[in-house]
Regions:
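Asp-based, Mg2+/Mn2+-dependent phosphohydrolase catalytic module
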Residues: 1-37, 51-67, 77-294
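Canonical radical SAM enzyme core domain
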Residues: 46-49
Length: 295
């Protein structure tokens, strides 16, 4: 299983300094672990390195090992290594580039003296972004660097309600300036879905993706042929879920997170929605094919 974090398991304040655990989160993860059902947390937040974020979850009582915490930077580091991108200009805090450096990628910051070509610009959590930062990134893109971002999502759920995503705003400025195409490494990209599946050592069809955003977790699950499960504890209410078009509509919407335990099975037997109100398997496969054709 792949769980979203903000709005699904926890709610944070705007500064990410304090978290509240959402109902059922501790119990669900603890039960999954006791049943030997593998799970990961996949956040679009890039402020902290994965191990540091996992430690924050453990302090809240959530059973999350370091290797079970994935961020967009985890995906980006893997993607950059695969594509041979060795020099990356990072727009973001110290935690944004940590996973890249762990994979041997040279990370550069705006204003630092550089020699040699910049291969990519990577935008993450950057509340202190300045115009000189944007100019440095634009110059690198004009010089041939590819544009990547941790997240291209407008909002995420916090205790204060919907909060804008910094990287969305920064990338908007860079795209307007340069006309560059952007590659998203976090949700809802297929890069994120495939990386999570590789880490779980499962086919996407055997994975459930649980989240609160139709444009993020559900869209990623649909694109990747995973099972999409929606929750109402974040940015989307039950009535809003019902109004979603088919490509953004989950196969189940949970009244409570703990309801997910009704229809998960151990590794090797897949994930099923054949609990109360679940569609027959044939209908589920046909719905997936129809949704895929419309994308």
């Amino acid at each position: 299983m792949v769980f979203d974090v903000d709005g699904t398991l926890v709610l944070s304040d705007r500064s990410l300094g304090h978290y509240d655990v959402l109902p059922g989160a501790r119990e669900v993860l603890t039960e999954l672990r006791s049943r030997a059902i593998p799970y990961l947390l996949l956040t679009n937040g890039s402020a902290y390195p994965p191990a540091e974020q996992a430690e924050k979850m453990r302090r809240l009582g959530l059973p999350v090992d370091d290797h079970q915490m994935l961020t967009p930077s985890s995906v980006a580091a893997d993607l950059f290594v695969r594509r041979g991108l060795a020099r990356v200009l990072v727009l973001g805090g110290e935690g944004v580039g940590h996973a890249l450096r762990e994979r041997g990628i040279l990370t550069l910051r705006p204003g630092e003296p550089t020699s040699g070509k910049v291969d990519a610009v990577y935008v993450g959590w950057h509340p202190g972004c300045t115009m000189p930062d944007i100019e440095a990134a634009a110059m690198a893109i004009w010089g041939g660097a590819r544009l990547y971002t941790a997240s291209d999502v407008r909002f995420f759920a916090t205790k204060g309600g919907r909060t804008i995503g910094y990287s969305y705003a920064i990338v908007g400025a860079l795209r307007r300036l340069t006309g560059a195409r952007v590659t998203v490494t976090g949700k809802p990209s297929l890069h994120a879905m495939r990386y999570a599946a590789e880490r779980l050592r499962l086919a996407a069809a055997d994975i459930a993706v649980v989240g609160d955003d139709p444009l993020v977790e559900v869209l990623m699950a649909r694109r990747g042929r995973a099972l999409a499960i929606g929750v109402t504890s974040g940015v989307t209410s039950a009535s809003e879920w019902r109004r979603q078009p088919p490509p953004r509509r989950p196969e189940r919407v949970l009244r409570a997170l703990a309801d997910i335990l009704e229809f998960v099975r151990p590794p090797g037997s897949g994930v099923t929605t054949r609990g109360p109100g679940a569609p027959p398997r044939g209908r589920r496969r046909r719905a997936r094919r129809a949704a895929s054709a419309r994308q």
